[in-house]
Amino acid sequence: LVTFFAAILWANVATAAVFHSRSEIADLAFPDCDRVETRDVFLSPEQRERIEHAAGSALDGALITIYEGYSGDRLVGYAMLDSHLVRTLSETLLVVLDASGAVAATYVMAFHEPPDYLPGDRWLGLFHDRRLSDDLRVGRAIVGIRNDSSWPGP
């Protein structure tokens, strides 16, 4: 019995993957920028409520970290980490926005579900050039990830 539970625990640990660390955020999000500034923002209850309503999901807390990339004095864009549950385990994405607020890139930083549920580049690309709107969610402009043969794959 102990061996069985140890095998289950090992299987869950074995599927966890960290692809990038926080120290890589600047290079991933803003490879051509000469500086990246980090700002911690404490959201007011009203700001948090607006964000949660727009996103259709709850935030983990009121403190968010925003990374800002600059080329000289020109703001190139923003980046933020988004950690959430996939099924029962978490993933962390790095979402990069250009200066106008459109999605410039999305990176999987860490993924703790089995690899079959890992979003591929093709799926992450569905977010590219999109802005926050009611259509920017799974089931509308974004198709869900499926781990069966009917999904066209990444």
Locations of the language-model features?
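Intrinsically disordered terminal and processing segments
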Residues: V2-T92, D98-P154
